[in-house]
């Protein structure tokens, strides 16, 4: 039986002699999407397809929870890297590398979790302006950096 498929852009796909129609699905939003094939006469079938984030266009963003803390190896800040693709879709399970100058990092490499965060803690004993940075493990030349100000502990009287 011959069936016609109407695509969302108005095009149609027609079945061949074997009753198969081929369509190419494209999208920019990651996640589950329902595809419906309807035959003339009303019968239809649905299938859920999953689009994943495009790791080739992945980019990292770096947030610092506290950029002004005490340099005593007790005061700390959390670095939180998020990774998204070129369409803004979060990328899970991608490795982020961290570096820092005159600071101690809880880890130098972390994979993004199911919330698409890769987090580490930073401490230091040196007062002054320090640079911390993050990059994707597979794109080490694309680095994003932030400055941290570490201050001396105020003496109490």
Predicted segments with their positions:
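The feature marks long extracellular or luminal low-complexity segments
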Residues: 1-157
């Amino acid at each position: 039986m011959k069936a016609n498929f109407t695509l969302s852009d108005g095009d149609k796909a027609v079945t061949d002699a074997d009753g198969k129609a081929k369509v190419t699905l494209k999208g920019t939003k990651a996640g589950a999407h329902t595809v419906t094939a309807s035959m003339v006469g009303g019968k239809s079938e649905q299938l859920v397809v999953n689009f994943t984030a495009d790791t080739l266009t992945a980019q990292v963003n770096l947030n610092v929870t506290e950029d002004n803390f005490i340099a005593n190896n007790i005061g700390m800040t959390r670095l939180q890297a998020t990774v998204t693709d070129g369409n803004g879709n979060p990328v899970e399970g991608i490795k982020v590398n961290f570096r820092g100058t005159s600071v101690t990092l809880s880890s130098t490499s972390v994979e993004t979790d199911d919330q698409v965060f890769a987090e580490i803690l930073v401490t230091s004993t040196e007062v002054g302006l320090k640079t911390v940075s993050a990059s994707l493990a597979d794109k080490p030349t694309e680095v994003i950096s932030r400055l941290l100000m570490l201050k001396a502990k105020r003496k109490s009287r």
